[in-house]
Amino acid sequence: MGKKIIWVVALLLGLHTTSQAQVYIDNMYKQANAMANATIKGDYTTLLKYTHPAMIKSMGGKEQAMATIKQGVAMLKSGSLNIKKVSIGKVTQTVVEKENIQCIVPQLMDMRIAGVDAHSNNYLLGITYDGGKNWYFMNTASSTPEKLRQFLPELNKKLTIPKSNTTYK
């Protein structure tokens, strides 16, 4: 009888841990997709919401970051770069630490650049400091792990940043 109770308790604890993991992954997907949709719509307020505070600080603060994002959105609207579709793939890596949760997630983008169709396979670094309730993202396409660590010294060395690639049609 005692062994059965121990097994039931162990099973319930395992299910609880799994459900907690699913909650933070679900939140990450929801927020990464919100950011992807904001990219297509040119919604700079939402883009700023999911931009890591260290990146905002490096841009000179919220106001300057907002101006930089607005400038980027204006470039998109000018027609030289037209993002057709952005989708978020399945998490490839996750590291759970005491202070944060970090993950790598693919970001697939179909776009038109100066009249040429292109498909981009990028990777986002996602990080949360509150158990997965609120996520921040950084595109790793034009960065190295060393450069990312300048912004995020807490970046776990176990994470492998895959190389991004763009194909033109």
Residue ranges and their predicted role:
Residues 10, 36, 54:
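Generic anion/oxyanion-binding catalytic loop in active/binding sites
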Residues 19-41:
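Short, low-complexity N-terminal intrinsically disordered segments enriched in polar/charged residues
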Residues 29-30, 45-98:
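Short solvent-exposed beta->alpha transition segments
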